[in-house]
Structures are given as C-alpha cells and as structure tokens.
C-alpha cells in the first residue's frame, strides 16, 4: 500500500510515534495544521518512507509503502458523532482529543464529559490548589507527578481520571506547557483498562440518551460492542 503526502514547506508537522499496548500496534500520528493523519500497523511490520523537498512548488513530500493490513485515518475538522462510541478503540481517541484539546474542543460528547468536573471538585475541592500546591504540576517533574497521582484511580473510577487529566491539560495550555498535553492524553487513554473504558462508554451513552441525570459509574454492562444502549443512539442526536 503506497501513500503520498504533500504539505507546504512553511507548515509545521507534529509527529507522535508510540506503541499501543491495548491495540498491540505501532501508531504514527501526524498533524499538519488542522489535518490529522493516523497510521496503525503491527509492530513487526516494516514501513519504507522517503521525505523530500520539492523546490518547484515549495512543498515537503512524504512518500512510502505500508504493509497491506494497515489502518489509515485522515480527518480535517471532522465532526465527532456517537458512532465513535460504538467502538472502544475509537472511544479512546475521543478521550485523548478531549484531554489534549480541553480549552478549544466543543460538541455534545465533549460537553457531556465536562460534567465530570463536578466529581473532581467534589473529591478534591479547589482544583487550582490541588494542581499548584499539592502536585506542583508546573514543576519540571509536573507531568510525571500527575501521572503518579492518578495511576491508582485508573482501575477504580476512570471518570475522575478523565476529569483531572482534562483540567490539568487545560491548565498547561494556559501556562505555555502545551507540549505536555499530547503526552498526557496518549498515556491516559492508553492506560485505562478495557473494562473501565467500556463502563465509561456505556454510562456516557446513557447520559447522552437522557436516561440518567449524570454520567454514572454502574457496572451492569460487560464488554459488548453491540450493546443496545450504545447502538440505539443516532448521529442526529449527538452530532457536534
């Protein structure tokens, strides 16, 4: 499978390469302005690429050959709809985007996730005090200290982890530490166990359907991508 990407030479290309333990795949994510490219392939595959500069049209050209069984995604300001909630892996991307872009993101799904802030405030009170005084998230070890703080909660209640992660990402974006947001988003979304991911997704669907007044933490749902609670939700109801 061959690919060819051309971008204006004056643009900045942000690339993130990581191994997803949940998907057991190597993931390459590129961002060129508002365009996001995601490539996923098995870790034992070889990817041949060639990057060159075309002086005739002042563009950077990336060409290569990928393994046949490769998932490629490309989105330019793509609206997020409930269809993404049907699949646990796609839902992970939703959480990652929510944590990473908390300051600028909008839409019904993200607005619903923002209601989880109340849980964090109820648990820890003044969030600014928690970040600045207790965790000192702006210090050199701030990212590491925050991850250590929430790691034990990930298997207990992912709702608070998602809330705190999005809030600290929002804080970093305002304090010129935006570079930490991507690392945190990828780590948190990849660290949440499948069971917790399914539970959060299930309860989020119920909330968006109007079946509950808040995103609950019930565990009456087992891993099943064909759950009627999720599949009954239409794009029309949740387009953002």
Swiss-Prot record:
Expression induction? Expressed in the early phase of the viral replicative cycle.
What GO CC annotations are associated with the protein? Answer: extrinsic component of cytoplasmic side of plasma membrane
Pfam families for the chain: Poxv_Bcl-2-like (PF06227)
A single GO BP term for this record reads: symbiont-mediated suppression of host toll-like receptor signaling pathway
Q: Which Gene Ontology molecular function entries are recorded, alphabetically? A: protein sequestering activity
**Alphabetical UniProt keywords:** Early protein, Host-virus interaction, Inhibition of host innate immune response by virus, Inhibition of host IRF3 by virus, Inhibition of host NF-kappa-B by virus, Inhibition of host RLR pathway by virus, Viral immunoevasion
- Going by the entry's taxonomy, the superkingdom of the source organism is recorded as Viruses
Q: Which family does it belong to?
A: Belongs to the orthopoxvirus OPG176 family.
| Subunit structure, interactors included | Tetramer. Interacts with host MYD88, TRF4, TICAM2 and MAL.
Task: Provide the function of this protein.
Answer: BCL2-like protein which disrupts the host immune response by inhibiting the TLR4 signaling pathway leading to NF-kappa-B activation. Acts close to the plasma membrane and targets several host TIR-domain containing adapter proteins including MYD88, TIRAP, TRIF and TICAM2. In turn, blocks the host NF-kappa-B and TRIF-mediated IRF3 activation.
What's the name of the protein?
Protein OPG176
| Organism from which the protein derives | Vaccinia virus (strain Western Reserve) (VACV)
């Amino acid at each position: 499978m061959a690919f060819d990407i051309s971008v204006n030479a004056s643009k900045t290309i942000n690339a993130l390469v990581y191994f997803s333990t949940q998907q057991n795949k190597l993931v390459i994510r590129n961002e060129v302005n508002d365009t996001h490219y995601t490539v996923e392939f098995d870790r034992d595959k070889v990817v041949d690429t060639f990057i060159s500069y075309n002086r005739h049209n002042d563009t950077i050209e990336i060409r290569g050959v990928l393994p046949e069984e490769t998932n490629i995604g490309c989105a330019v300001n793509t609206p997020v709809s409930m269809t993404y909630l049907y699949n646990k892996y796609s839902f992970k991307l939703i959480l990652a985007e929510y944590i990473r872009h908390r300051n600028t993101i909008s839409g019904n799904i993200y607005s619903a996730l923002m209601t989880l802030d109340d849980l964090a405030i109820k648990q820890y009170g003044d969030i600014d005090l928690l970040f600045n005084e207790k965790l000192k998230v702006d210090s050199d070890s701030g990212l590491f200290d925050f991850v250590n703080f929430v790691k034990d909660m990930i298997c207990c209640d992912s709702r608070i982890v998602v809330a705190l992660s999005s809030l600290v990402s929002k804080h970093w974006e305002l304090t010129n530490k935006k570079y930490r947001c991507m690392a945190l988003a990828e780590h948190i979304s990849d660290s949440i166990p499948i069971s917790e991911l399914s539970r959060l997704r299930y309860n989020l669907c119920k909330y968006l359907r109007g079946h509950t007044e808040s995103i609950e933490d019930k565990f009456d749902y087992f891993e099943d991508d064909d759950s009627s609670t999720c599949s009954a939700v239409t794009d029309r109801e949740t387009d953002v």
